[in-house]
């Protein structure tokens, strides 16, 4: 059975490529930027380990244009095509799915992603999609679904795997119930870096000061906080799962010693905190990985790391600390349910800077309530943080309503 895990090149009128994976807020990049879809890469590895013929088909990182990517996919004639999408590009995907079905009608199309998982019937009605995964645990579900399809001709009628909406025919859909919210992440394999052509992601990424870099297998799936109104990792249908410290340390050691990786970034919604964060830093030091010329980085929240932890992280050669500032007026922070103030942010930035970490600020603009005065306050405060040395780098994006988050529903 042949399975393609596919990411088509999506280019807008300005020549910018859409990145639909590993993002809390969809982005279009003019400068080449290739982000490894970690959970889908774990799924690809798991299916390959089960004996399936897996094609890692990321047209973006392979620098293909759309026509070449599409031609190659159709020529391979996969039995299953797994796609991932998000709100701003759903119509593109619906059209693409119908086109794929017109050329390889027997292929089973599986849609993943936070937009379709929250409204699966929409994607089934708007396209020829066969299955919508309602789970964020793509790897765990595909590991069960693909063998079931392979072994049961009537899989559409009686599939017992939870967290799916399945097309029985043109108008009838079959829902298998809620997905399992918490999984034991240690059961999912580390990403096979050769399978996903890891070097395609190792250089063109602004998060890396040194290359080759790599995204680690995430230690937290989704987010421990899970309340920010704009973020897809939000809602009563989601919680978080955690990977063990030792399993993650083993992967870091392999990435450094076998792949020669010079920077490792963990793109978990929010990385470890407290005891796990300190244990991880001590593990890096105990294994001598902090002396291998490799930097480490992760996402966190203001207020999640105390001074003892930050000190240990600094000793362990952590560098890049990505934190979501989002805005610098309290009304916006409260409406986004961020759970901190600008004063809290400044206090944390001073702590990071004291221990020579490199805070990277993420800011968004374009909130539907945002006034010029609020925007100017954000600009002036961020300028102060940057020019006083409290932050090293920053990125600014438009706040895009997506994936039926609370912010998206407010905008609707």
Where are the regions that the model predicts?
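Glycine-rich beta-alpha loop elements in corrinoid/cobalamin-binding modules
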Residues: 39, 46-47, 52-180, 404
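Hydrophobic/aromatic residues located in beta-strands of well-ordered beta-sheets
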Residues: 3, 54, 109, 161, ...
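Residue-level recognition of beta-strand->loop/alpha-helix junctions
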Residues: 56-60, 84, 232-235, 363-365, ...
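Short glycine-rich His-centered loop
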Residues: 3-32
